């Protein structure tokens, strides 16, 4: 087990040194304006990422537009390929497929992969075909059921850790072989 603690700047330098490309994302296109899309958009906007959300439900578009005034809300069917291209799919730095239909998310990601060099994120609800999906190169696959598990693990670890309230996020990367914790160290914390 290896533990690596660093400031954001030093972490970036470390990843460059080991030749692990880490490009900050400046813009993202999200197809699907549900709860995950909403919260992801909030996080991205807080990190100064330009966000475009494609959502087909007009009522949901209104809610998103009111709740996320900094985001661009596009009320359109996200599976409309010509629309995605006309809205700059080819130049997007991150494409995130978050509809409620797994098959649609897979096809959208494969389409985005063909037309964009951006980072890809695909939401999959059903776990039964994860071995097949792993061979499709869909970028980062997000399983909401696993995310729930990760939040529970994060909470339990926080309870076990006296500085637990400082833990912000638990990440699992490289096929769950690596765990990364993001936490806040306050100025008055003991060194």
Task: Describe every region a protein language model picked out.
Residues 1-191:
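Cytosolic regulatory regions of ion transport systems
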């Amino acid at each position: 087990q290896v533990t690596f603690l660093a400031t954001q700047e030093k972490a970036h330098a470390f990843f460059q040194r080991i030749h692990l490309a880490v490009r900050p994302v400046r813009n993202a296109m999200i197809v699907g304006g549900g709860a995950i899309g909403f919260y992801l958009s909030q996080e991205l906007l807080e990190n100064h990422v330009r966000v475009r959300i494609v959502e087909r439900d007009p009522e949901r578009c209104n809610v998103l537009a009111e709740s996320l005034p900094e985001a661009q809300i596009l009320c359109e069917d996200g599976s409309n390929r010509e629309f995605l291209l006309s809205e700059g799919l080819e130049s997007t730095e991150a494409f995130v497929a978050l509809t409620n239909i797994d098959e649609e998310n897979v096809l959208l990601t494969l389409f985005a992969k063909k037309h964009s060099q951006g980072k890809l994120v695909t939401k999959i609800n059903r776990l039964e075909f994860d071995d097949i999906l792993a061979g499709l190169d869909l970028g980062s696959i997000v399983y909401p059921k696993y995310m729930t598990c990760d939040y529970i693990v994060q909470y339990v670890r926080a309870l076990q850790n006296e500085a637990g309230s400082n833990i912000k996020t638990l990440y699992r990367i490289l096929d769950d072989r690596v765990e990364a914790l993001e936490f806040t160290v306050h100025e008055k914390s003991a060194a």
